Amino acid sequence: MAKQALNQLTAAVRTETGKGASRRARRAGKIPAVLYGHGTDPQHLELPGHDFAAVLRHAGTNAVLTLDIDGKEQLALTKALDIHPIRRTIQHADLLVVRRGEKVVVEVTVVIEGDAAPGSLVTQEASTIEIEAEALSIPEQFTVSVEDAEPGTQFTAGQIALPKGVNLISDPELLVVNVVNAPTAEELAEEGAGEVTEEPAAAEAEEAGEEEAAEAESE
């Protein structure tokens, strides 16, 4: 199901820029942003933090935003987000100007559904694929079914069914999902034993290195 331009946000034009102004905006519950594209000069904005985060949480980063900027409507896509490494809050957003009917290139999430055959292990090699679609018709996600898939089964980007009007940009041979034989209990036990025996060896090597360093210092 494609997203529609229903994500209304009122954006204020920023009169101050710089780190200090950005910190003040965030303390006031706003998110600093820059809007660019179509040859226009970058426009510095402030977005309502709670509302913007809610749109991304419920509709995803490919959601088309309908911005109200000084009473004028502007469609935009979220191009990049700066996330605080500890608090995981949005620090800044880059927004791309889009127009109705315009095609854009975006990355769309791939999800796995179903249960593979007994004795198999499913690994996801790529979490997204890159596609080209109209800005107002970007798929929310793509689904790969691994129901009853046997070990040795692979799903590439080119095998994912795309809606009409959506073109694949990623390499069609890009491996997205891989079904392999699940490790046996014996293999897991051997792997665990190998890790245990490696630890003392590493400790001995470290001690030897420390002794050599100490001898070198004493000379």
From Swiss-Prot:
Residues 187-198, 204-219 have a biased composition (Acidic residues). GO terms for biological process: translation. Pfam families: Ribosomal_L25p (PF01386), Ribosomal_TL5_C (PF14693). The keyword Lipid biosynthesis does not apply. Keywords: Ribonucleoprotein, Ribosomal protein, RNA-binding, rRNA-binding. Residues 187-219 are annotated as: Disordered. Transmembrane segments: none annotated. It comes from the Bacteria. Signal peptide: none annotated. One of its GO terms (cellular component) is cytosolic large ribosomal subunit. GO terms for molecular function: 5S rRNA binding; structural constituent of ribosome. InterPro entries: Rbsml_bL25/Gln-tRNA_synth_N, Ribosomal_bL25/Gln-tRNA_synth, Ribosomal_bL25_b-dom, Ribosomal_bL25_C, Ribosomal_bL25_long, Ribosomal_L25_dom, Ribosomal_uL5_bac-type. PANTHER family: RIBOSOMAL PROTEIN L25/GLN-TRNA SYNTHETASE, ANTI-CODON-BINDING DOMAIN-CONTAINING PROTEIN, RIBOSOMAL PROTEIN L25_GLN-TRNA SYNTHETASE, ANTI-CODON-BINDING DOMAIN-CONTAINING PROTEIN. Belongs to the bacterial ribosomal protein bL25 family. CTC subfamily. Part of the 50S ribosomal subunit; part of the 5S rRNA/L5/L18/L25 subcomplex. Contacts the 5S rRNA. Binds to the 5S rRNA independently of L5 and L18. This is one of the proteins that binds to the 5S RNA in the ribosome where it forms part of the central protuberance. This is Large ribosomal subunit protein bL25. It comes from Mycolicibacterium paratuberculosis (strain ATCC BAA-968 / K-10).
